[in-house]
Amino acid sequence: MKRIDFENGTITGNILGAALPMLVAQLLNLLYNVVDRIYIARIPGEGTAALGAVGLCFPLIVIITAFANLFGSGGAPLFSIYRGKKKEPEAVCIMNTSFTMLSASALILMVIGMCFARPLLILFGASSEALTYALPYLMVYLIGTLPSMLSVGMNPFINAQGYSVIGMTSVAIGAVANLLLDPLFIFVLGFGIRGAAIATVLSQLLSVVFVLYFLTKKSELKVRLLHKDEIPKCINYAKNITSLGTAGFIMQITNSLVTICCNNVLSVTGGDIYISVMTIVSSVRQLVETPIYAMNEGTSPILSYNYGAVRPARVRKAILVLGMMILAYTAVMWSLIILVPGTLIRIFTSDTSLVQDTIPALNQYFAAFIFMDLQYIGQTVFKSLNKKKQAIFFSLLRKVFIVVPLTYLMPYALHMGTRGVFLAEPVSNVIGGSLCFITMLCTVLPELKRMEK
């Protein structure tokens, strides 16, 4: 079984070796998420309304994913750092701690979500009509919280051991299953929007079975739940996992907060149609960001391993390669969004009126997207090198302190209406992205220079 050699392989080769399978995995994962929306939008007579309703479920789905990444992406860099230090027993303990926290939090979130699904959807901006579609979808989706969180949260530990192709395969299993099951449950069996959720849950179940089979039977370092007597000695690991994962957690939770704020403002200033517009804009963003996420996550274990092994030159080169790859990709995608926005929008809807409403919104939202690269690069470096405070601060800065206030200020105080909601994003990209990247350059590069001495 081929593994990436973090110890001796070239930096560019290692990054490509990790990022390319992860890119395929993330594109498949995107397909996993987007295919629901494509099929839902084409349900006869109710597609547009149902699509907007699924958009109302995004905040809670994002919260579930955020908890998966809190313990998964929080644990994997520490796991890699300890592997770089040749401390494998500690690395295994970190992985087992993450697995235990993922399992416990998934069960808690499922129960809370099911108990409060209706009031949460109303809080997120659901009208009485939208609620008839959103509530059935969400209730079924919540049943799959445990397999969803384990498949997402444990996959980074497969990649951190160098098995990027296996990590890709675990995602592919779920994505292909979802692609096949969606039309069966939505159209053939006539379950409509509820059928999309059933297909997703079954697909997640298949994916997690593969992940756990590999990590318990085939991988070099194997996972299991913590025993009761092991919990006290793993408390410090749990604290470190949580604190390191908090940055990504905050980014996803604040994404959810921004979605709630946007939906609330758009429902007042533009009506339910603009919630559907925002759902499509968010879907396009997810499409564009997927390869960036793959590059970040592919580079992260390489940064962490070499930082733990005290190899500053390799860390510095990995940062440079990551930056060049992300900037080149974003320049191409940004050009496509500006020049042919309708092509991307029509992936998600065939409603001509909805396409026309979405085109200006998409152009406004992505006006300064290239600045977001600076945030991605800075955050990936901070997380991979265990720089918890910086990672958390810049996660909060862009979303909580810039986007959320502007989402209310621009439409109401500046009388920009729906346009103000979409323009809040590029303003935050310029300010937050620039500050994050400059701080990374001023703190990390001097530290790497000191390590050489």
List where the protein language model places each region.
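Interfacial/gating helices of multi-pass transporter permease domains
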Residues: 17, 40-62, 129-133, 193-194, ...
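Short alpha-helical transmembrane segments in multi-pass integral membrane proteins
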Residues: 1-19, 79-144, 190-245, 303-368, ...
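Generic alpha-helical transmembrane segments of integral inner-membrane proteins
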Residues: 23, 27, 31, 35, ...
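Small-residue-rich hydrophobic transmembrane alpha-helices
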Residues: 51-111, 148-167, 263, 275-335, ...
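Helix-terminus/linker motif at the lipid-water interface of multi-pass membrane proteins
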Residues: 27, 31-52, 121-128, 184-191, ...
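N-terminal transmembrane alpha-helices
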Residues: 6-38, 42-46, 59-74, 78, ...
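Transmembrane helical elements of multi-pass membrane transporters/channels
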Residues: 17-36, 140, 174, 203-207, ...
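Short runs within selected transmembrane alpha-helices of multi-pass transporters and secretion channels
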Residues: 72, 141-159, 167-178, 196-211, ...
